[in-house]
Amino acid sequence: MAISTFSIGDLGYLRNFLQNECNWFRICKKTFYREYRSVATSSPIFSLKNKPKKYCMHCEMVVLKRSHEFMFSLAVNGIHFGQFLTGIMKFKKKQVAEGLCYYVLELGSISPVDLSFIPKYNSDCVTSMHCVTPELIYENCSIVCPEEASRLTVKGLGDNKLIPLGGCGVWCLKNGGDLYIYAFVLAYDLYVACYDKTIFPSLAKIVFDMIACDSEDCVFCKDHNKHVSQAGHIVGCVSNQETCFCYTPCQKKMTDINNPELISLLCDQEINKIDIMYPEKKASLSLDINSYVHGYLGDEPCALKCVNWMPIRISSALSRLIILSCPVCKRVVMD
């Protein structure tokens, strides 16, 4: 079997994709080999040459060890892609909760190699990991205190610059190789008492559900079907799993409220318009939701209830799972 031709650029893009865009789940561990699987969203830097673009990248990797080197065979979307050699290969375990863990891959430089055979990939094997649920997110987050918030930059230059993820009141912090989601979410007691347990009640989600348009052709309000399974259960694209943060309505300024049932979570008054706000000058993270969204009754502004909301930081292990399962959030963070 001849070694496929890969340019230096091709190998660099592949290495970047495998390390930074894939969450790996271990499928098989044997004495002489291990097998891992990743279900990733489409990549802005890596694709299969001469193949139609796929919104889901199902990657299967069989790893062999020889002396002080590692060899791995890679298949993408059911097609054997190539075999590669590297001197450094580490799978760093990320434990989200009992029953939900995955691995982040660290690779040295890679080069093509010919193993003279193609291993059998366990394409039909399904991971047994637990799903990401709203309850799991609450269990894996911390409340942001004023001291921490003062060190986070929402607008302007700063060491801890938050990246807006698109929705109202949600950001990502890149800290070395770790990702952290910061968001405003409904207080836990209110979630337990009066909210749908299958949906994570972020401020971004609540505001989105209040003002999203009804057009089936709107790519902002309706086009949410290019996610992938956060725990690798399903090969192929899935709809937003209601635990993402990519809720960006097409209209943000002085928009009519279409779903008044949620108003009481934001305000005691019967507001009829929402205005999503963005800081215009250098600012650290405010813990007041009125800094990011205003309610209006006609033209009169109404104060929103901060007591119903809490600012949180989601653990890095869970944040990475959520962000990399969403094509929108992933691209925003990678840019």
From Swiss-Prot:
Give the UniProt keywords, A-Z: Host cytoplasm, Host nucleus, Late protein, Virion, Virion tegument
Cited InterPro entries: Herpes_UL16/UL94
Q: Which residues cross the membrane?
A: none
Pfam families, A to Z: Herpes_UL16 (PF03044)
Compartment(s) where it occurs, according to its Swiss-Prot or TrEMBL record: Virion tegument; Host cytoplasm; Host nucleus
Entry GO CC? host cell cytoplasm; host cell nucleus; viral tegument
- The answer to whether UniProt assigns keyword Isomerase to this entry is no
Family label? Belongs to the herpesviridae cytoplasmic envelopment protein 2 family.
Role this protein plays = Plays a critical role in cytoplasmic virus egress. Participates in the final step of tegumentation and envelope acquisition within the host cytoplasm by directly interacting with the capsid. Upon virion binding to target cell, a signaling cascade is triggered to disrupt the interaction with the capsid, thereby preparing capsid uncoating.
Q: How does it assemble?
A: Interacts with cytoplasmic envelopment protein 3 and with the capsid.
Q: What is this protein called?
A: Cytoplasmic envelopment protein 2
| Organism for this UniProt entry | Human herpesvirus 6B (strain Z29)
Q: Which gene encodes it?
A: U65
